[in-house]
Regions:
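Generic detector of short, well-ordered, non-transmembrane alpha-helical segments enriched
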Residues: 19-20, 81
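Bacterial N-terminal signal peptides that target proteins for export
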Residues: 1-9
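Bacterial N-terminal signal peptides
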Residues: 10-19
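Surface-exposed repetitive/solenoidal architectures
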Residues: 26-158
Length: 158
């Protein structure tokens, strides 16, 4: 009888651990920013000149919808536009959807963007070309960063 109870409890424990593992895996799968930010957020402001000011992570994520033509937006490479990032951003909460064609200038006043893998920033598997200029923005990529000097500052590299 004791053996049967032990076997039953072990089976119950095993089944419970499988259920917990499956739930944990589902919870750990991140949503994409483009599925979460579905309308233009307050942190994405378009000026009269067409240039863009971004003040929060949701505003930066809205670039995905604009460039890739998602969430009711017509695809726009932002050619000739300047994107000014005014605050540090943490993009680690959701997965980034790679940008297709992107032709803008990104400027920041020595701001930092965390949690955005640079290798997934752009969709390099399509025929689009990328022309962009980045100033004063640091991308933190898993304990190291790529720094771009602020406008007017000289780079240490020759």
């Amino acid at each position: 009888m004791k053996t049967q109870i032990k076997a039953f409890l072990m089976t119950l424990l095993l089944v419970a651990s499988f259920s917990f593992t499956a739930c944990s895996q589902e919870a750990s799968e991140k949503k994409h920013w483009s599925d979460v930010v579905t309308s233009r957020p307050a942190g994405y402001v378009v000026g009269e000149d067409g240039n863009i000011t971004i003040s929060d992570a949701e505003g930066f994520a809205w670039i995905i919808s604009v460039v890739n033509g998602l969430n009711g937006e017509k695809a726009n490479s932002l050619e000739g536009k300047t994107i000014l990032i005014t605050n540090n951003l943490d993009m680690s909460q959701y997965q980034w959807t790679p940008l297709k064609a992107f032709n803008a200038t990104i400027k920041g006043d020595n701001v930092e963007i965390k949690g955005l893998p640079v290798k997934t920033l752009f969709d390099l598997n399509n025929d689009a070309t990328f022309h962009f200029h980045i100033e004063g923005v640091t991308f933190d990529v898993k304990n190291w960063s790529i720094s771009f000097p602020a406008q007017g500052e000289e780079s240490d590299e020759e």
